């Protein structure tokens, strides 16, 4: 058997390959750090109070807007204060997005991909009211209506996008105590999430119906101010991200085809590690596929869910591969038989599968429902928020435990190698140099694997926390920089690209020789090669199991010869 390219590649060629890949890794970090803006931006929109039109409250195709021809007349705070009922059932809170800047009308770009809206409310109670302290987890009923229009539409040509009667729970605390009223500020609450930002302008109308028989909105005094924070992906970051995908996608596809052709040339069935490498490359290619270009022409509200599914498949495959990769290099194995997923790794991989399925179910409950109702959120109820928070914490803890377990497996591999290195002095010089070179290369690759795993787990945990930052009420400042995101994404591609090259079968063939002659010839080859620092590790004849792809995995089955 000729072994893998990792074993047969000369030291000089290997150094050139590793240096080139490291330069590509640095380039990925620099692209994100120097050319890409921050991944997400936001606008803070103050709700404009408009007087509702009598008889149109139940007309879901009717919208009030605050800018342009035919804009509504805003209601002043003093008018609300002087009204005995605080203009209950007469007010509409209007949010028109995006806001103008420097007297220029801005519009959303399809490069911005998605839009998330969260609310922060200030409510007030009269000082003379018997109910001065709002109850814990105050329930609020909101009539939410979302509309859109495009650049060439008239100012009044708003088209309905979504409508829903939503319930939200407020957690408020006193902010100001005055003679007339007590002002309470409430924690942010999620309102809507759009998986596609296909239109130029969006309009949000909020009504807070008060109904005594149905006991709607009777426990809070009156709305004082409402602030909407509209969060969107930055278009410049999307362009850099898609550029990376467009460049990396054909490279990974090409190296996969090259790898599988070399495997099929061999007179044996592919080994487990070769299958896993192919599946890993396929999952990465699915992630690299720049489907986001379609959103520039078509409205695809399911793109967020599809992106989560693609990333989930890649995570599941990557985590599974690392367990198999470390396990296949365990030099002391329980069984000499050929490894299979079912025989050796079902316990390890079942935990990964269960974790990924749990996150998938959670994602379906959130973003799957948002395909029908963008105002739906699992975070809206106290129980749902606790369940969602538990999922995020559990996912983060599981990722940390996985990384520790992977470190343990790598340590065990290194320990096995250390135990077997004691037999190297009894080997011939050729065999000893052969295995010392393999061990050095393998250790370097395993350390690179640990580094990749550590950054992946860190990125996963930070991503989960950053996504939930606007949905739970903790003062956590997390900003995933563009350099970190592009760097980790490039690292995945470079790491898998390197594995497909280094673990591809080597087709160098060496003449068969008698056992007595082969030792002498091997020693001469090693000494001559060492002098020029161009050691070729395939010069050693091998009688290993043809189902093994690496000489290192059959180290314990070798018999030293002189």
From Swiss-Prot:
Superkingdom of origin: Eukaryota
Primary residence: membrane
Biased composition (Polar residues): 539-556
A single Gene Ontology CC term: extracellular exosome
Membrane topology: Multi-pass membrane protein
Single Gene Ontology MF annotation: Wnt-protein binding
Chain positions covered by the region annotation Disordered: 538-562
Signal peptide (UniProt feature, chain positions): none
Localization in the cell: Presynaptic cell membrane; Postsynaptic cell membrane; Cell membrane; Endoplasmic reticulum membrane
Residue spans, topological domain Cytoplasmic: 1-13, 261-270, 333-344, 412-441, 504-562
Any one GO BP annotation for this protein: Golgi to plasma membrane protein transport
Bilayer-spanning residue ranges: 14-34, 240-260, 271-291, 312-332, 345-365, 391-411, 442-462, 483-503
One Pfam family, short name: WLS-like_TM
Glycosylation (residues): 58, 103
Keywords on record: Cell membrane, Cell projection, Developmental protein, Endoplasmic reticulum, Endosome, Glycoprotein, Golgi apparatus, Membrane, Postsynaptic cell membrane, Segmentation polarity protein, Synapse, Transmembrane, Transmembrane helix, Wnt signaling pathway
Lumenal compartment segments: 35-239, 292-311, 366-390, 463-482
Its biological purpose: A segment polarity gene required for wingless (wg)-dependent patterning processes, acting in both wg-sending cells and wg-target cells. In non-neuronal cells wls directs wg secretion. The wls traffic loop encompasses the Golgi, the cell surface, an endocytic compartment and a retrograde route leading back to the Golgi, and involves clathrin-mediated endocytosis and the retromer complex (a conserved protein complex consisting of Vps35 and Vps26). In neuronal cells (the larval motorneuron NMJ), the wg signal moves across the synapse via the release of wls-containing exosome-like vesicles.
Complex and partners: Interacts with wg; in the Golgi. Interacts with Vps35, a component of the retromer complex; wls stability is regulated by Vps35.
PANTHER family: INTEGRAL MEMBRANE PROTEIN GPR177, PROTEIN WNTLESS HOMOLOG
Protein family according to the UniProt entry: Belongs to the wntless family.
Name recorded for this polypeptide: Protein wntless
Originating organism: Drosophila mojavensis (Fruit fly)
């Amino acid at each position: 058997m000729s072994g893998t390219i990792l074993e047969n590649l000369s030291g000089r060629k290997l150094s050139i390959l590793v240096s080139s890949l490291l330069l590509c890794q640095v380039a990925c970090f620099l692209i994100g750090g120097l050319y890409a803006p921050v991944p997400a931006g936001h606008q803070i929109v103050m709700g404009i109070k408009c007087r509702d039109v009598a008889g149109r409250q139940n007309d879901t195709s009717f919208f009030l807007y605050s800018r342009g021809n035919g804009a509504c007349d805003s209601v002043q705070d003093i008018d609300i204060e002087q009204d005995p009922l605080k203009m209950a059932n007469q007010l509409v809170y209007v949010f028109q997005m995006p806001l103008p800047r420097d007297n220029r009308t801005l519009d959303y770009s399809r490069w911005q991909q998605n839009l998330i809206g969260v609310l922060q409310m200030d409510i007030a109670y009269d000082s003379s009211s018997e109910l001065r302290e709002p109850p814990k987890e105050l329930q609020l009923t909101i009539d939410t209506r979302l509309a859109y229009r495009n650049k060439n539409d008239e100012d009044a040509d708003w088209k309905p996008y979504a409508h829903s009667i939503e319930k939200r729970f407020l957690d408020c605390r006193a902010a100001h105590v005055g003679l007339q009223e007590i002002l309470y500020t409430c924690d942010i609450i999620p309102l809507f999430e759009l998986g596609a930002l296909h239109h130029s302008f969006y309009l949000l109308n909020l009504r807070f119906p008060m109904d005594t028989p149905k006991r709607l909105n009777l426990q809070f005094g009156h709305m004082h101010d409402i602030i909407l924070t509209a969060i969107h992906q930055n278009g410049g970051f999307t362009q850099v991200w898609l550029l990376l995908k467009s460049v990396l996608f054909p490279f990974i596809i090409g190296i996969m085809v090259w790898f599988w052709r070399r495997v099929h040339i061999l007179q044996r069935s592919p080994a487990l590690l070769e299958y896993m490498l192919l599946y890993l490359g396929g999952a990465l290619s699915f992630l690299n596929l720049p489907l986001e270009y379609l959103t520039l022409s078509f409205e695809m509200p399911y793109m967020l869910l599809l992106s989560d599914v693609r990333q989930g498949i890649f995570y599941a495959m990557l985590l599974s591969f690392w367990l198999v990769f470390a396990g296949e290099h365990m030099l002391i194995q329980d069984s000499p038989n050929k490894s299979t997923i079912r025989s050796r790794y079902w316990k390890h991989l079942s935990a990964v599968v269960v974790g990924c399925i749990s996150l998938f179910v959670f994602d379906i409950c959130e973003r799957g429902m948002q395909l029908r109702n963008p105002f739906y959120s699992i975070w809206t109820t106290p129980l749902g928020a606790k369940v969602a928070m538990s999922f995020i914490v559990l996912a983060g803890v599981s990722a940390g435990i996985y990384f520790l377990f992977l470190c343990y497996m790598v340590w065990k591999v290194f320990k096995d190698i250390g135990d077997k290195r004691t037999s190297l002095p009894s080997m011939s010089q050729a065999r000893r140099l052969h295995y010392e070179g393999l061990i050095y290369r393998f250790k370097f690759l395993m350390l690179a694997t640990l580094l990749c795993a550590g950054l992946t787990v860190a990125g996963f945990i930070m991503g989960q926390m950053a996504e939930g930052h606007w949905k739970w009420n903790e003062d956590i400042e997390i900003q995933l920089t563009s350099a970190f995101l592009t760097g980790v994404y490039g690292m995945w591609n470079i790491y898998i690209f390197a594995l497909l090259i280094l673990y591809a079968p080597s087709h160098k063939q060496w003449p068969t020789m008698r056992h007595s002659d082969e030792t002498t010839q091997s020693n001469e080859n090693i000494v001559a090669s060492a002098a020029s620092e161009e050691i070729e590790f395939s010069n050693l004849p091998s009688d290993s199991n043809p189902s093994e792809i690496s000489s290192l995995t059959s180290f314990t089955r070798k018999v030293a010869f002189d």
